[in-house]
């Protein structure tokens, strides 16, 4: 007997990939940036390492822009993916929840992209 069902292709692997990348990025790079910018620099360590001019030139370079985009966009996708599945787990049914959460992540990613590249 043959099974002639046509299965709908899922878009979930794309979102799981962004979720995983955002979680990994947030676990590895975000604590390092918080440690350096939020703790070590205010304590006066490395006073010449992050002057305004150096920070601005890094942020305006292509590597710096990509770094800041990844710092913003990947954890954003991770967080909104978690919220989407948390609502499902708590049985709070948001109408068109995939469109709401992933659409919001896409819109905020575009806003971040515009903001970073107009810096």
UniProtKB/Swiss-Prot annotation:
Statement: the UniProt record of this protein carries the keyword Membrane: yes
Gene Ontology MF annotations: succinate dehydrogenase activity
Transmembrane segments: 26-46, 61-81, 99-119
Cellular component aspect of the GO annotation: fumarate reductase complex; plasma membrane
Topological relation to the membrane, as annotated: Multi-pass membrane protein
Physiological role: Two distinct, membrane-bound, FAD-containing enzymes are responsible for the catalysis of fumarate and succinate interconversion; fumarate reductase is used in anaerobic growth, and succinate dehydrogenase is used in aerobic growth. Anchors the catalytic components of the fumarate reductase complex to the cell inner membrane, binds quinones.
UniProt record similarity statement: Belongs to the FrdD family.
Name of the molecule in the record: Fumarate reductase subunit D
């Amino acid at each position: 007997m043959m099974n002639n069902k046509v299965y709908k292709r899922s878009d979930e692997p794309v979102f799981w990939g962004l979720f995983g990348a955002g979680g990994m990025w947030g676990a590895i790079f975000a604590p390092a940036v918080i440690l350096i910018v939020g703790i070590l620099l205010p304590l006066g360590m490395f006073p010449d390492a992050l002057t305004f001019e150096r920070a601005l030139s890094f942020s305006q370079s292509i590597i710096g822009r990509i770094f800041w985009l990844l710092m913003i966009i990947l954890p954003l996708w991770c967080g909104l993916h978690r919220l989407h599945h948390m609502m499902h787990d708590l049985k709070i049914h948001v109408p068109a929840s995939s469109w709401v959460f992933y659409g919001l992540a896409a819109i905020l990613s575009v806003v971040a992209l515009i903001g970073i590249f107009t810096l």
